[in-house]
């Protein structure tokens, strides 16, 4: 005889929705799919109405007397509820400050990696603290560090705007970027493709009849 499976008490119990045959109340107040009140009817009649409409009977208020059910497309209802929950979770996202560190002599590959990190943070709705770290005598190259940070802000201008300009902080130079609320719209001048100037050549004037006669006499 095979051993009986052990019940894992740590595993969460999935609660099934109260729809259709899982509704056990004998009398129900039923609302039709279009919002029409069907009144208080017995469970079997409510199930028949939902079946005729090829929809589901869903318990929406169990504490009411009698309990309230609505006829609806439960699959569509569930999808919309999950969508609303995701949107609410997204709106409740707590803004964090993520940090991107680098040296002022960073190579192109590492710089691209830092840009990628910053883009991910900004798209998640977080602010980004860009930090240039100095070691030893490197502190004298603050101008190069500021140039690097402003270059970074320029490369990220479609996703972010400067919240705090580059400044010294101890032995570091920092800059804060915040996600851009509205998309960056470039001006027509920035999007304009430069065209080559067309050189205009003026044709020489045509000789008059008198000039041609004089030329023949001279010959």
From Swiss-Prot:
Q: PROSITE patterns, alphabetically?
A: IF3
Q: Which GO terms describe its molecular function?
A: ribosome binding; translation initiation factor activity
PANTHER family cross-referenced by the UniProt entry: TRANSLATION INITIATION FACTOR IF-3 (PTHR10938), TRANSLATION INITIATION FACTOR IF-3, MITOCHONDRIAL (PTHR10938:SF0)
Q: What is an annotated GO biological process for this record, any one?
A: ribosome disassembly
State the function annotated in the UniProt record: IF-3 binds to the 30S ribosomal subunit and shifts the equilibrium between 70S ribosomes and their 50S and 30S subunits in favor of the free subunits, thus enhancing the availability of 30S subunits on which protein synthesis initiation begins.
A Gene Ontology cellular component where this protein is annotated is:
cytosol
Q: What is this protein called?
A: Translation initiation factor IF-3
